[in-house]
Amino acid sequence: MSRPKKCRHLSSCVPCSLFKPNGIPSSELEKIQLEADEFEALNLGDVQKLSQLDAAASMGISRQTFGYLLASARRKVATAVTQGQALLLPLNVKKD
């Protein structure tokens, strides 16, 4: 049995709910779901350029968990971009 998820502190606003290739209806595309905590990890690690330790502390999780989230988010974004898939973004992320 896996451990229950820890409560994570999220503070990013998502500007839209879907990124997709131009000119292709979303109904014809495979979709990849980016979770709220993965979105936050991308924002803190790649946009705000925080260290993994600082970003993990900001989210209230361990540095190792932050690293897993960041790697998962990067993999999903890279897959969507390189394979022409739609990337679904979380709508429930709100600023604290």
From Swiss-Prot:
This is UPF0251 protein Shal_3723. InterPro entries: UPF0251 (IPR002852), WH-like_DNA-bd_sf (IPR036388). PANTHER family: PTHR37478, UPF0251 PROTEIN TK0562. It comes from the Bacteria. Belongs to the UPF0251 family.
